[in-house]
Curated annotation (Swiss-Prot):
Organism: Streptococcus sanguinis (strain SK36)
PANTHER family in the record: TRNA (GUANINE-N(1)-)-METHYLTRANSFERASE
Catalytic activity field: guanosine(37) in tRNA + S-adenosyl-L-methionine = N(1)-methylguanosine(37) in tRNA + S-adenosyl-L-homocysteine + H(+)
Presence of keyword Transferase: yes
Binding site for S-adenosyl-L-methionine: G108, L127, G128, D129, Y130, I131, L132
Subunit structure: Homodimer.
Signal sequence coordinates: none
Molecular function terms from GO: tRNA (guanine(37)-N1)-methyltransferase activity
Key word Methyltransferase present: yes
UniProt name for this protein: tRNA (guanine-N(1)-)-methyltransferase
C-alpha cells in the first residue's frame, strides 16, 4: 500500500515510524510519503486566507493543496479529507481502506477548507462529533487502524479478527499469568482446557459486554440461534 499525506506538520507523524506501522514499512508492505503543502504556496507562503463574504477564522486556500496533489505520482487513489462533517470512521471503513493500493490524506489545520478543494476528494471522514486542532491526529488514527489489517502486517490473522468490532461484538475478557493476583483469580473455565466450554464462555462474555456497553452494535449484528439464546439469558440476568 502507498499512502501520501498532505499536511503542514509532517513532523507530527513521527509515531508512524514505530510499532505495527513502522514494521509494515520495514517489510516493504507500506510506503508513506509526506507533502508539506506550504512549500507549494505562492511567494507569500500563505496557505490560508479570509473567507469571501466575511466570517470568523481562516480557510485553507485551494492553490497550495491542488499543486501538492498534482505533484504526487498516483494512479487511482482514494483521496480522504479529514473533516468533522464527514462520515464517521469505524472498523468496517478501516477494512474497506485496507483493500486499497493508494490512499491520499488531506489534513487541514485552520477554520476550514476552500470548498473547491473537495473536488479532489473521494471521501470526507470524521473521527466523531468533536473538533481537533488539525487533521493529523485523525489521519494517524485511521492509518494505524487500516494498516494493521493489511495481509502479512500482523503475523496471525486471528490477532486482529478477534479484536473488538472485527467480529461485530466487543472483545471478551482475557487473562495471563499469574492465576491468582491480589485475590483476583482467572475464571476456572479458562484453566479447564475444554475448548468448547472456553469458546462458549468467550462468546457469552463478548455478548454480555456488548449488550451492557454498546447495545447499538447489536442492531446490525446477525446472530446465530446459539447467540440469541445467550443474549436472552443475559437480558434476563440484567433486567433489574
Amino acid at each position: 500500500m502507498k499512502i501520501d499525506i498532505l499536511t503542514l506538520f509532517p513532523e507530527m507523524f513521527a509515531p508512524l515510524e514505530h510499532s505495527i506501522v513502522g514494521k509494515a514499512r520495514e517489510k516493504g508492505l507500506l510506503e508513506i510519503n509526506y507533502h508539506n503543502f506550504r512549500e507549494n504556496a505562492e511567494k507569500s507562503r500563505h496557505v490560508d486566507d479570509e473567507p469571501y463574504g466575511g466570517g470568523q477564522g481562516m480557510l485553507l486556500r485551494a492553490q497550495p493543496i491542488f499543486d501538492a496533489y498534482d505533484d504526487i505520482e498516483k494512479k487511482q487513489p482514494r483521496v480522504i479529507l479529514l473533516d468533522p462533517a464527514g462520515r464517521t470512521f469505524d472498523q468496517a471503513y478501516a477494512e474497506e481502506l485496507a483493500k486499497e493500493e493508494e490512499l491520499i490524506f488531506i489534513c487541514g489545520h485552520y477554520e476550514g477548507y476552500d470548498e473547491r478543494i473537495k473536488t479532489l476528494v473521494t471521501d470526507e471522514i470524521s473521527l466523531g462529533d468533536y473538533i481537533l486542532t488539525g487533521g493529523e491526529l485523525a489521519a494517524m488514527t485511521m492509518i494505524d487502524a487500516t494498516v494493521r489489517l493489511i495481509p502479512e502486517v500482523i503475523g496471525k490473522e486471528a490477532s486482529h479478527t478477534d479484536d473488538s468490532f472485527s467480529s461485530g461484538l466487543l472483545e471478551y475478557p482475557q487473562y495471563t499469568r499469574p492465576y491468582d493476583y491480589r485475590g483476583m483469580v482467572v475464571p476456572e473455565v479458562l484453566m479447564s482446557g475444554h475448548h468448547e466450554n472456553i469458546r462458549k464462555w468467550r462468546l457469552y462474555e463478548s455478548l454480555k459486554k456488548t449488550y451492557l456497553r454498546r447495545p447499538d452494535l447489536l442492531k446490525h449484528y446477525e446472530m446465530t440461534v446459539e447467540e440469541e439464546a445467550m443474549l436472552e439469558e443475559i437480558r434476563h440476568a440484567h433486567s433489574d
